[in-house]
A protein has these predicted regions:
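Beta-propeller domains
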Residues: 1, 20, 31-35, 39-44, ...
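Short coil/turn segments at secondary-structure boundaries
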Residues: 1-2, 13-22, 110, 209-214
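GHKL-family ATPase ATP-binding module
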Residues: 1-4, 8, 151, 181-182
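Generic structural signal for bulky hydrophobic/aromatic residues embedded
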Residues: 3-6, 53, 199
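A structural signal for alpha-helix termini and helix-coil/disorder junctions
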Residues: 5-13, 202, 206
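PDZ/PDZ-like peptide-tail recognition elements
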Residues: 9-62, 141-145
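Cleft-lining beta-strand/loop regions that shape enzyme active-site pockets
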Residues: 30, 49, 56-67, 76, ...
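Gly/Ser-rich, acidic/histidine-flanked active-site/gating loops
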Residues: 70
Length: 226
């Protein structure tokens, strides 16, 4: 690890604990993981309260939201009273109550406007994808608002498989706009982005002018710039 740091080596695939992503080495010891429900919590008036449900647009969401299958819709302002019958307190936060619950069904008791209700929910081990997608949605809304809908926004997290999925899944919803912003900040690298170039650099090859109806050009799945 010291040599990798001194030489500034990239793509070494050596992680903490001596574990390699290609096998070998010792993995980190098992721990009871904290479960997450995809919400922002705030402690106020002696209760743990949902400040916001992290909810990206379904069409662009990569991760299943743990509250999506709940019979009752949890919303901002709801108070979490207990998990599996054990009450929460100032000293027992939602994170403490959800230790060791990842992938397991738990009963969460909420209160809204003086009425309590229980839901069955399966906590997830990370909210990273949900929060990442919500951030993308916020950026897209900001671009649409600032340009009166004339400019589209696409974020790609890397130039690997995930980034290619990002590009294609967002491209077709934004391609009708006059121009596109392709945001690649903090991208994780990957492959030479030939597929990106092929899609974004497509040129029109034919035009259709019908006697009745609108004219159009092909390929239909290309963006030809403003």
């Amino acid at each position: 690890r010291e040599m990798i740091a001194e030489l500034n080596v990239g793509h070494a695939y050596y992680l903490s604990g001596g574990w390699s992503m290609f096998g070998g080495g010792e993995q980190e010891p098992d721990r009871d993981a904290v479960g997450f429900l995809g919400v922002d919590w705030i402690y106020e008036n002696e209760h743990w309260t949902v400040e916001k449900v992290v909810q990206p647009e379904p069409g662009f969401r990569a991760q299943h939201h743990p509250l999506e299958d709940a019979e009752a819709r949890v919303q901002a302002g709801d108070r979490l009273l207990a998990v599996d019958g054990r009450p929460l307190s100032a000293d027992r936060s939602p994170w403490a109550a959800l230790v060791g619950t990842v992938g397991l069904g738990v009963e969460a008791t909420f209160e809204r406007d003086g009425n309590t209700f229980d839901i069955l929910v399966t906590p997830i081990d990370s909210e990273a994808e949900l929060r990442h997608d919500a951030w993308i949605d916020a950026n897209r809304r900001q671009v649409h608002k600032a340009t009166d809908g004339r400019v589209g926004y696409i974020y790609v997290r890397n130039t690997g498989i995930e980034g290619q999925t990002d590009l294609v899944s967002q491209f077709f919803a934004e391609m009708h706009r006059e121009a596109l912003i392709i945001d690649e900040r903090w991208n994780g690298g990957g492959q030479i982005p030939t597929r990106f170039i092929e899609l974004l650099n497509r040129q029109p090859v034919s035009w259709w002018a019908r006697r009745h109806g609108d004219d159009w050009r092909s390929p239909s799945d290309g963006h030809f710039g403003p």
